[in-house]
């Protein structure tokens, strides 16, 4: 309950019952902590701290930690460490001020940008078209974000903040614009009421999002307006280049002007709130990066634009940066962050000196290793780095970290390095948004258009050979997946000795969506992991229930929604580890490789995959026919599923038997190449490349 008296009463009861030394925390989003702890003992106040999470807490990394002047600093650090290690959060230290860091800065940005749009005639689609990934913000951009959060929540937070900060020089900017209040009165609150700035509808069997007319408050079909400057900015390259381009274009282009006239006030406001809400720039930046999914917070964004040039631009527009920013520039310091002797420093508005950025001892930065000369080899798609202590790291950095010929090439280079006496193991990991979205379809389409099936066959064999080499190499291989880990990316993991997965890892063998089957050993691994173990344990066990599960996971392209679900699907084993903080993956995987290296013995080559034979295959195929009769599967779905059934059961084997892994790999390759010759597979591949969505034909 976000009311002071009930919280005080609760804290009195907590003090009476809590064991000695227990940390006591409240997750208030705005009530001052010192008010909640008023009347409690000094001992209570020393172990009392605020913890504020951002919704949805599963996906947003931010945890604001709010000590009072009485809180023991060791308690603060313990809570921060617990949040980072156990909960997978990023902890920032906020002062006990209204709305702390994220909602103080975020409310200003949200209300100011909405007001500017309304007062200057910008359409909802226009604003969302230029305030998303183009400027380093999430796809929800501005108005879709309001719909997601709920307009009543956004307006309520702004109104409460307005009342709580009478001394804020920008207080009037915190007031919700009248348009938002009118929308609230009309119950246009966003997703929770079914309509807000957007309204979800269905027309001609397709989901559409109609857009609100801010004059009539009626929804109309989306117009998808052309924004030429957005396209031009996108072509500039990275975030710094895109933002610099837009700021430079602002005087002549209204869309670029919107970016400038909302971005600069937001950065200036953030500077004026330091050190009121936080003593460090990194905590303010992290609050916006982790709580609002911004690529860079206000001060890192300012560095991208050039601090001195941006302050001059602000002054010409009548925007006031904090006095400490001007003092920093006058002292000859031109950036908020800089690196000296391998250590990243941040300017402190309190000490007026550069101080080290807080480092997470569990975080390994691959870019820093590269800067330190630890890169052993590199090409356009992958690199091989030295993690120290005899452990190497194979890093993917192709588009989407998709598996291509250059990744295979670098994988083979990693195998060569593993032959060295001073190398004890290999980690396969990266710091991209996703571990790997699967095979490089563009590379495959290029070969198809040239009629070069031989090249595709060579590529399939090369991938199979590499992954089998990872599986049997006499030194441990540990994969560290996170995010989407699909198709060939998952097959890389399945052939590792151990997987150290982020909690938010989404694994699946999804090849049927493009009219193919897993051909890098994925189908074989499902037979080995799901079907074979129960038959090893009890030879008379009926294999069909286990075959059915493996078959459905592949034929229906099932994807795990978390690492825990991936364990249920046998993508992860009981020996694999789940790490809640993705920043700790490389470090944890390295430790795992070192642990395995001590007395490591590779798996034996053996007839270790159970092939159930033709009778089991017929049972699986009958299940497909049933789905087709019920119109749950197309005719071509049945063709693909038939190949999956054939591989899982061992092809044309008349009787059940144990076979080597290579036997199923050969079946995979033949099925894959056969499907590649089919026009309907070509249609599925082209549809996915064009629309980003799988096609059913």
Where on the chain are the PLM-derived regions?
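Short glycine/serine-rich donor-binding loops of glycosyltransferases
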Residues: 490
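N-terminal glycine-rich phosphate-binding loop for ADP-containing cofactors
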Residues: 1-433, 442-462, 466-475, 482-486, ...
């Amino acid at each position: 309950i976000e009311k002071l008296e009930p919280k005080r009463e609760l804290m009195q009861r907590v003090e009476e019952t809590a064991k000695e030394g227990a940390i006591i925390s409240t997750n208030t989003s705005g009530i001052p902590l010192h008010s909640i702890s008023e009347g409690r003992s000094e001992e209570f106040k020393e172990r009392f701290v605020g913890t504020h999470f951002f919704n949805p807490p599963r996906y947003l990394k931010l945890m604001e930690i709010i000590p009072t002047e009485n809180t023991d600093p060791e308690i603060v650090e313990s809570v921060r460490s617990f949040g980072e290690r156990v909960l997978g959060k990023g902890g920032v230290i906020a002062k006990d001020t209204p709305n702390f860091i994220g909602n103080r800065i975020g409310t200003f940005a949200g209300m100011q940008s909405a007001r500017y749009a309304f007062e200057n005639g910008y359409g909802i689609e226009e604003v969302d078209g230029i305030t998303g990934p183009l400027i380093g913000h999430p796809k929800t951009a501005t108005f879709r974000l309001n719909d997601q959060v709920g307009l009543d929540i956004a307006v309520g937070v702004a109104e409460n903040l307005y009342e709580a900060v009478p001394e804020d020089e920008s207080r009037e900017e915190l007031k919700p614009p009248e348009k938002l209040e009118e929308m609230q009165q009309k119950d246009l609150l966003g997703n929770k009421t079914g309509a807000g700035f957007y309204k979800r509808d269905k027309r001609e069997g397709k989901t559409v999002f109609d857009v609100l007319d801010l004059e009539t408050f009626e929804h109309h079909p989306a117009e998808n307006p052309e924004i030429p400057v957005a396209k031009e900015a996108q072509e500039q390259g990275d975030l710094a280049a895109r933002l610099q381009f837009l700021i430079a274009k602002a005087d002549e282009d209204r869309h670029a002007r919107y970016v400038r006239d909302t971005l600069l006030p937001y950065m200036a406001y953030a500077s004026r709130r330091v050190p009121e809400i936080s003593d460090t720039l990194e905590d303010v930046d992290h609050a916006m990066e982790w709580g609002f999914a911004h690529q860079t917070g206000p001060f890192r964004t300012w560095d991208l634009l050039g601090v001195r040039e941006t302050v001059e631009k602000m002054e010409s527009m009548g925007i006031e940066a904090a006095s400490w920013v001007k003092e920093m520039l006058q002292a000859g310091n031109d950036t908020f962050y800089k690196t000296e002797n391998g250590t990243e420093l941040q300017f402190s508005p309190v000490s007026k000196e550069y101080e080290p950025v807080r480092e997470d001892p569990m975080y390994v930065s691959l870019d820093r290793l590269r800067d330190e000369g630890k890169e052993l080899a590199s090409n356009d798609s992958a690199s091989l780095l030295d993690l120290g202590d005899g452990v190497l790291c194979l890093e993917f950095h192709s588009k989407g970290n998709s598996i291509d010929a250059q990744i295979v090439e670098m994988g083979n280079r990693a195998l060569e390095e593993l032959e060295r006496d001073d190398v004890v193991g290999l980690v396969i990991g990266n710091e991209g948004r996703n571990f790997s979205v699967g095979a490089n379809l563009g590379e495959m389409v290029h070969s198809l258009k040239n009629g070069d099936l031989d090249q595709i066959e060579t590529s399939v064999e090369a991938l199979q050979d590499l992954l089998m080499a990872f599986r049997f190499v006499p030194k441990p291989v540990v994969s560290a997946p996170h995010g989407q880990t699909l198709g060939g990316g998952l097959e890389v993991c399945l052939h590792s000795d151990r997987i150290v997965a982020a909690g938010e890892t989404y694994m699946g063998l999804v090849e049927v969506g493009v009219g193919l089957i897993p051909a890098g050993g994925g189908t074989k691994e499902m037979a080995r992991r799901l079907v074979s173990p129960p038959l090893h344990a009890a030879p008379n066990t009926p294999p069909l229930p286990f075959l059915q599960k493996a078959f459905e996971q592949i034929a229906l392209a099932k994807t795990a929604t978390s690492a825990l679900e991936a364990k249920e699907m046998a993508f992860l084993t009981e020996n694999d580890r789940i790490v809640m903080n993705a920043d700790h993956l490389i470090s944890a995987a390295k430790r795992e490789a070192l642990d395995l290296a001590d007395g490591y013995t590779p798996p034996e080559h053996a007839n270790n995959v159970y092939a159930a034979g033709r009778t089991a295959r017929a049972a699986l195929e009958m299940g497909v026919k049933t789905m087709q009769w019920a119109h749950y599967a197309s005719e071509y779905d049945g063709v693909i599923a038939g190949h999956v059934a054939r591989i899982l059961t061992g092809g044309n084997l008349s009787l059940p038997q144990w076979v080597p892994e290579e036997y199923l790999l050969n079946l995979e390759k033949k099925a894959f190449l056969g499907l590649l010759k089919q026009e309907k597979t070509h249609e599925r591949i082209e549809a996915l490349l064009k629309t980003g969505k799988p096609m059913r034909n």
